[in-house]
Amino acid sequence: NDLGVVVLGRAASEGVDWEKGDKCDPSEGITNPMQITLKEKAMIKLAKEKCKKVIVIINAVNQMEIQELADDPNIGAILWMGIGANYAPKAVVDIISGATNPSGHLSDIYATSSLSAPAMINYGDYSYTNKDQVIARSKGTGQKYVIEAENIYTGYRYYETRYADYVNNLGNARSNAGSSYTDGNWEYSKEVTYGFGYGLSYTTFSQEIV
């Protein structure tokens, strides 16, 4: 009972996109699939009751909403393992046992709310009004489309760029547009759980530029 390991996961692959409210069981207390379900919360609670230390492993390529885990003082560590095929479990065991030191950094951002990004707001199930004609063409396109109004500002690019604009008071970066909260203006610290490039390790050495 010294250590409890809880694994949270979400399935994903090319061409399999999560939509707002997709595959959500109302009885699980979630409104979008990136949130932690009641069953998962119960599993984490049990681990904390039975074990001295608890580590939560995120086995997903999607960025889940894990602010409550980051705020929980009874969770010793959160480890992202992605979907690493056959060798990933061995690497996780080596990290947990102390055989190797975790030193990776996030390649994308963990937002407090996965629905706050413009790319998510713009996404949807849209079909051309003349889709029957499109399908009839021998070399036609598909019947679905998405207007990517967010341009390059997907993932961390949106949050990091808006933060820079917020600091420099540019545009409407300080407005409540796109905010996950209704108690004030948009704030990076409230919108982001773990920023781009975030990553901790257990090394004891330090480096100094002289």
Predicted stretch roles:
Residues 1-210:
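C-terminal non-catalytic regions of proteins with extracellular/luminal or membrane-system context
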